[in-house]
């Protein structure tokens, strides 16, 4: 009763107690508690201890979740986090006394536990509520706890992701030397050193939490959870969970077959875990399994295995692993990674022993270390000296049909026998059909280089055997076969065996019957036929054959002629070949044949080449030595103009040459008519207009030189009407000066008036200057005034460019000298061109 006396202080308390005895209920308890809480606030008669006493009695009598929530809520408001352990005990008592599911109350419990930041409380709370919740609440609770662990507990660095082999070469070189030093001179297992260094960073609490979570998590959460688990660095729990959830090893029988495929980096971390736990047998089992399942990651696994052997000071096995990997990898970046790793290790190994021998006299006298250093110096030297050969090995593995790689390989050996071995290996390996387009010609060169090895050694018969074999290789492209035959012939010529060289070329260039159908078939088959079928079309061999024939003073000229004729029949001759053939015939006094070569060759080439050949032919035929008739020469000129007249080629020189020929024959009018016929041709662009202007200029110049003023007047009249205004103005001035020189001032004034209307005054200053000077010398005041009035009028009216007007309406009317005020014809081809 002493305890009751501490709390029951007045009649109202007794009344509540009596009511609770008579008809106990939660409502009575709540009114009782509210009554005492009021006393705590009003007069301080009561304390929190009194309220606590009532709540304890209420939850004992009515242990429902609602009552407990009211009690815990009051307690937390009263004490906040100062007494969080007592609060947790209340939660614990509540859960143990309440029956049935907790519902959202379980979430409240976990939120409270999280707010304490007490890892033991959080774990106990989690274990307390999980079995009393439904699926949705369990998921929510785990999200809360895992979120807390991720934000506040788990180390911030990320787990493995996109693991690649670059990490091995990113290792600090001095750290590598330190590791080697510990292995060589301190003894022990490198994994022990790593374990000591990592113990401080292990997050055992999160590891235990995640292990607990994996027991209830769906399989689709395994990957994410295992990655979080890796960040805890608790390798024992990591191995345990990987065994259970990746390898499904619940029997303890070391089953290493994963039921579901996970990202490769997870398996790699598991491999690292086995390494750190020194489970070497398991490590090798998993390694072999991964090597079989992930061949695309062979290099990373190889470096892992090399590192594994290094940590156990098993350097011989490490060397074998790296050497084998260097000879098998087919990717450049992988080769670089393995090579760099190997070289760095060997260098660090040698330097570590060297430094220790230098600093420690006891080690200096031990032969073991000197021998170790020498052995690894040899390995290091071999790696560096054979670098280019190793790289070439890699290239050939990447593409055994790459001829350039084999050619490069032949340069890496100086020894005769080894060089020949490379050529033989290359010839056996390369499939001519699989040689890429960009390497056409290289395979033929490789055969020739092989033969050259013997030829340079004066083993001519062996070299000829190689050349003979090369001519039978089914090269898909003609370049390769050309190189073989050409090089063989050149070599024979260089040792003065000219007859053999000619025999080789004649054999290669034998033209088969129905050669046209053979060529067509080769083209249609798209290189599926061997190039031997069209060897006779090789321009390179034909040109060399002809050069060789022409270089022999005693050769029969008919042999050369037959070669040239065959070349023309096959349509393989070049413009230079035409020139050479014509020159050869001319030197052999066959002038008629020389001209015929030009005439035949002209039709074999595009207009640009035709023009050059026509020029040569016309120059040649006009030489006195040919004694060609004038009619024959004119016939050739006409053929030339007819063939080239409708092309875009500038043939002004042909017109001028033809005109000069007629002048030489005293046919001046015909010479000028020829130039005018070229000038009258229609034009469509600036360049063609310039060409026509040049011909008009040439015609006017020759007319002025060889014909009289009347002819010149007629020519200038037509020129002015044919050309656009901007070009015609020059000839208006020329015409004006002609009339002035003949004292026909009226006609000169009419020409000036006409020319003034062709262009705006601002663009026609030369004409206006000439007109003003003309009126001052030959006119009077009225004519001068008319000139000024016309100029003012034109300055106002000619706002639009007269060039534009002339396009649609022709030039300004031109008054011919023979008939006054005659309307000039329009020029429909006139366009505005200002050059």
Swiss-Prot record:
SUPFAM superfamilies listed in its UniProt record: TPR-like (SSF48452)
* Membrane-crossing segments per the record: none
Any Pfam family from its record, for instance, is HAT_Syf1_M
Keyword Repeat attached: yes
Sorted alphabetically, which Gene3D superfamilies does this protein's record hold?
Tetratricopeptide repeat domain
Coiled coil ranges (UniProt) are none
Residue spans of the HAT repeats: 7-38, 46-77, 313-348, 414-456, 458-494, 517-551, 589-623, 628-664, 707-741, 743-777
List, in alphabetical order, the GO biological process terms annotated in this UniProt record. generation of catalytic spliceosome for first transesterification step
Task: Name the GO cellular-component terms.
Answer: cytosol; Prp19 complex; U2-type catalytic step 1 spliceosome; U2-type catalytic step 2 spliceosome; U2-type post-mRNA release spliceosomal complex; U2-type prespliceosome
| Localization | Nucleus
Q: Which UniProt keywords apply?
A: mRNA processing, mRNA splicing, Nucleus, Repeat, Spliceosome
What PANTHER family would the database entry show?
PRE-MRNA SPLICING FACTOR, PRE-MRNA-SPLICING FACTOR SYF1
What is stated as this protein's family in its record?
Answer: Belongs to the crooked-neck family.
Q: What does this protein do?
A: Involved in pre-mRNA splicing and cell cycle progression.
Q: How does it assemble?
A: Associated with the spliceosome.
Q: What is this protein called?
A: Pre-mRNA-splicing factor SYF1
């Amino acid at each position: 009763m002493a305890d009751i006396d501490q709390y029951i202080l007045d009649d109202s308390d007794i009344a509540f107690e009596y009511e609770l005895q008579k008809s106990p209920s939660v409502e009575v308890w709540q009114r009782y508690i509210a009554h005492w809480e009021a006393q705590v606030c009003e007069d301080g008669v009561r304390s929190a201890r009194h309220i606590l006493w009532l709540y304890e009695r209420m939850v004992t009598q009515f242990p429902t979740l609602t009552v407990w929530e009211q009690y815990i809520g009051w307690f937390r408001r009263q004490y906040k986090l100062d007494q969080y352990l007592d609060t947790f005990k209340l939660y614990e008592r509540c859960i143990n006394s309440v029956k049935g599911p907790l519902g959202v109350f379980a979430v409240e419990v976990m939120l409270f536990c999280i707010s304490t930041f007490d890892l033991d409380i959080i774990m106990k709370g989690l274990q307390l509520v999980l079995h009393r919740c439904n699926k949705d609440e369990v998921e929510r609770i785990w999200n809360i706890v895992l979120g807390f662990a991720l934000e506040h507990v788990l180390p911030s660095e990320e787990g493995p992701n996109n693991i690649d082999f670059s990490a091995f070469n990113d290792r600090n070189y001095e750290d590598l030397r330190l590791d080697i030093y510990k292995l060589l001179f301190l003894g022990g297992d490198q994994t022990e050193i790593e374990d000591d260094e990592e113990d401080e960073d292990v997050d055992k609490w999160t590891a235990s939490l995640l292990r607990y979570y994996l027991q209830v998590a769906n399989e689709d959460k395994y990957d994410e959870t295992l990655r979080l688990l890796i960040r805890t660095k608790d390798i024992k729990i990591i191995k345990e969970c990987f065994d259970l959830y990746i390898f499904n090893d619940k029997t303890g029988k070391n089953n290493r077959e994963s039921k579901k495929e996970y990202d490769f980096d997870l398996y790699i971390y598991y491999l690292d875990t086995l390494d750190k736990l020194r489970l070497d047998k398991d490590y090798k089992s998993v390694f072999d399994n991964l090597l079989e399942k992930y061949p695309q990651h062979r290099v990373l696994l190889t470096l892992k295995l090399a590192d594994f052997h290094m940590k156990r000071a098993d350097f011989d096995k490490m060397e074998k692993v790296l050497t084998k990997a260097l000879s098998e990898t087919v990717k450049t970046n992988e080769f670089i990674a393995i090579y760099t790793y190997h070289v760095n290790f060997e260098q660090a190994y040698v330097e570590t022993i060297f430094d220790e021998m230098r600093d420690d006299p006891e080690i200096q006298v031990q032969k073991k270390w000197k021998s170790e250093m020498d052995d690894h110096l040899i390995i290091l030297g071999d790696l560096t000296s054979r670098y280019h050969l190793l790289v070439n090995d890699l290239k050939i593995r990447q593409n055994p049909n790459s001829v350039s790689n084999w050619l490069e390989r032949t340069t890496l050996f100086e020894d005769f026998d080894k060089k020949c071995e490379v050529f033989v290996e290359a010839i056996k390996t390369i499939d001519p059909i699989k040689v890429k387009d960009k390497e056409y010609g290289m395979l033929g060169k490789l055969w020739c280089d092989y033969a050259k090895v013997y030829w340079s050694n004066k083993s001519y018969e062996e070299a000829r055997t190689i050349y003979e074999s090369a001519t039978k290789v089914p090269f898909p492209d003609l370049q390769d076969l050309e190189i073989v035959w050409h090089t063989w012939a050149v070599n024979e010529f260089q040792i003065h065996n000219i007859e053999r060289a000619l025999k080789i070329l004649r054999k290669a260039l034998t033209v088969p019957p129905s050669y046209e159908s053979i060529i067509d078939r080769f083209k249609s088959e798209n290189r599926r036929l061997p190039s031997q079928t069209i060897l006779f079309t090789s321009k390179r061999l034909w040109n060399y054959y002809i050069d060789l024939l022409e270089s022999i003073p005693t050769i029969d000229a008919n042999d050369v002629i037959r070669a040239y004729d065959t070349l023309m029949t096959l349509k393989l001759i070049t413009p230079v070949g035409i020139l050479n053939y014509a020159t050869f015939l001319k030197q052999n006094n066959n002038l008629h044949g020389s001209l015929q070569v030009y005439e035949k060759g002209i039709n074999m080439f595009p207009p640009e080449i035709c023009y050059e050949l026509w020029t040569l032919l016309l120059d040649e035929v006009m030489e006195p030595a040919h004694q060609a008739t004038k009619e024959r020469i004119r016939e050739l000129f006409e053929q030339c103009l007819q063939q080239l007249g409708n092309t875009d080629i500038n043939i002004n020189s042909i017109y001028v040459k033809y005109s000069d020929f007629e002048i030489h024959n005293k046919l001046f009018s015909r010479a000028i008519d020829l130039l005018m016929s070229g000038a009258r041709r229609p034009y469509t662009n600036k360049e063609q207009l310039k060409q026509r202007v040049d011909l008009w200029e040439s015609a006017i110049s020759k007319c002025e030189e060889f014909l009289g003023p009347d002819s010149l007047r007629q020519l200038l009249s037509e020129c002015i009407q044919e050309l656009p205004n901007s070009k015609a103005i020059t000839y208006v001035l020329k015409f004006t000066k002609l009339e002035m020189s003949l004292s026909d001032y009226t006609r000169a004034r009419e020409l000036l008036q006409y020319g003034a209307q062709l262009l705006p005054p601002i663009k026609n200053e030369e004409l206006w200057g000439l007109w003003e000077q003309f009126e001052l010398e030959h006119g009077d005041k009225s004519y001068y005034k008319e000139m000024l009035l016309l100029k003012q009028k034109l300055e106002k009216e000619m706002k639009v460019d007269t060039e534009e007007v002339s396009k649609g309406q022709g030039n300004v009317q031109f008054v011919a000298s023979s008939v006054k005020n005659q309307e000039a014809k329009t020029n429909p081809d006139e366009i505005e061109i200002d050059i």
